[in-house]
Every structure is written in structure tokens, then in C-alpha cells.
Amino acid sequence: MRLAMRLGVLLTVSLSLASTMRVTAVVAQNTAVPTSDELERRDQPVTNEDLRILQRASQILASSAVWNRHDTRICNPADKTWSLFCALEKASLEVLGEYRHRDVALQEVRFAVEDATKGQEFEHRLMDYNNLPSTKFEDIKQILKVATDRVSGRLAAQNHKKLP
């Protein structure tokens, strides 16, 4: 069984502004996210939201001018440039209202990376592929296209099966 973990820390910071007002910020960084054989299956059911996440990530990475090729997997909503990982995280937050690390959309991008790199081992597929010196912006867009096409095709097949 394949098991990948992101070691992490959950940091909670509280700031008292006045005796009646309290502001709390929670920062999750490198939170442990296990994977399993089930999550690594390439035939997971897909949803319209999966397709929208991939389409939105591609929109976020509209040009090479907004691509951050030095990913750290720390994403800030105020950023002006986005790595592959951060574009997917931002898209997930916009579409779902939350980030789901092992969501089918993100897994499909990981699978596209594996296929494009002929199974090269990465500790963090999205970050490491993004940061490879040989990776070009066009490669990032192609990875998103492959994942989008796969999800779109599976969604169409699922919807076809539902018809009477």
C-alpha cells in the first residue's frame, strides 16, 4: 500500500484587540494528508465540481506571467503568481468553498504528471513537477488539459449510464 504523508503543524494565533473583541486566525501548513490504494485508483467517480476545479485552475494560470515555477506549497490568496498546486488549491476553494487535498480533480492532475514523467518518483507530485527545471509553462497547461479531458470524458460516460 502506498502511503504518503505531509508532516505538519496546525498553528492557532489569537490576538486580543480589546476586552470585548477577540480575533483568531488558524493557519494550516503542511497538514498530514495520507493517501491509499483507494485514492490512487484512476477510475474514481467524477463530479461537475471536479471539472469546474480543473477549468478554473487553467483560467488562473492564464499566462506564463502568472505562473510561479518555484512552488513551496504555501499559497496566499493575495499572491499574484500561482504554481500548479496553488492554482488547484485556489480553484478548489472557489468552487467547493474548501480545499480537499485528495479530491478527484487534484488526483487526476497527479496522474497526468505521473504519465507525463513516465512514473518518475516525486515526494510531492504537483510541487515537484512544477519545480523541475525542464518543466515549461506549456507543460503545466498540457497537464491541466489532460486531466480536464479525462474528467470530462468520465463525466460524460457517467451521465450517459444514467440515461434510461
Task: Locate the predicted segments by residue.
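Compact alpha-helical subdomains of small soluble proteins
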Residues: 90-164
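Positively charged n-region of N-terminal signal peptides that target proteins for export
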Residues: 1-7
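Bacterial N-terminal signal peptides
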Residues: 8-19
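Signal peptide processing junction and immediate N-terminal pro/mature segment
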Residues: 20-32
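Short N-proximal segments of mature Sec-exported proteins
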Residues: 49-112
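N-terminal low-complexity, Pro/Thr/Ser-rich intrinsically disordered segments
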Residues: 31-54
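Acidic/histidine-rich, surface-exposed loop or edge segments in extracytoplasmic proteins
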Residues: 34-41, 89, 122-125
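N-terminal regions of proteins, emphasizing targeting and processing segments when present
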Residues: 13, 27-30, 113, 117
